[in-house]
């Protein structure tokens, strides 16, 4: 599992960016006068599979992405780590493909593939020459229809996952900081706050019936979305999809867990000692507004103002002016982007600093930047600049990796909103945001009592992280 928030190199976006996007004039006028449109064909199979097709003939490739609505925080209490375990199991063979043959099939056909586990989904994707689209659809349907869940495969992957936890978290400096650590301190609901890698005891105790039932429950067409982007004819692709996916039976409807978080009324502070760390680190997180609300879009713009780019307020204050750190990182949804999740989320910022820089001084510097946004509405020029930056980031996402960036958005909007056409209306929602709403959103969601602070200190011991301010 790749734990970086952005691991795919963005491609050139000349054909995707409307003329005038980087104009120095009034950005909101520029936005209003340019229509961004992605072709989308959306339908559902009788078994519930959601299908989004988006032809793009700029390159002779096709991206195929299957998203299952089972992520870190949706897994049952006594099955922690199962979502991630299954990411590995899905490459161990299916009815017609042997162990690791899916990987060989893609690579032998000149393609690339991967899978990842995120907060609200597990995904699998391939990018192949367009003439291999049907082969990949057959292969994805084959493992959706029947995974090779065997005792041998299970034991093997239990060991692989356990080793991954040791390599990526336990034996790595700052392992899991802040993406894995912060949700455990900032959230109150178990589903949002448990260790997403899972309790190794749960993983090691998993037996074959457990794993078979997990697959039957979550890896079903009515719990999935399929997105295809690239050089193909939608009518031809639809015939292929119907041929291979339509006869896969649906599973019983899943009772979704309650993911809601209570309003945080008091600042939380947590600290942990990392014996492998060389320098202290600090992260802050604020609970986000509910997804798809006006305040949610306002927070997307506040993220641009505060954190994104060298002209952002936190970079200017903490790096350029005070020299407290070399960089400030973070954003909305550290495991993806502000569009591909479905539940409570954090806006996070983190930094590494020298030991002579005090945590309280960092927090004071952060407050000196945030409080003016809460006490006074920003000017239109600042809002326009944030809109231009956000549009640039959005187009960057749409243009990533030969169609995968677009497929990620389409699959997410299909899976969570039943509306992949949102890709064409998302900009209009940001254009509705006013300076007054920016201020109102900052007042509610960037208040100190909505904040969690996590400090990592170098040390020689590994005590339990201590909490205060709860």
PLM regions with names:
Residues 1-6:
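Positively charged n-region of N-terminal signal peptides that target proteins for export
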Residues 9-20:
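Bacterial N-terminal signal peptides
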Residues 28-42, 181-224, 256-261, 290-292, ...:
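Histidine-acidic residue clusters that define the catalytic metal-binding segment
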Residues 33-59:
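N- or domain-start disorder-to-order transition segments that initiate the globular core
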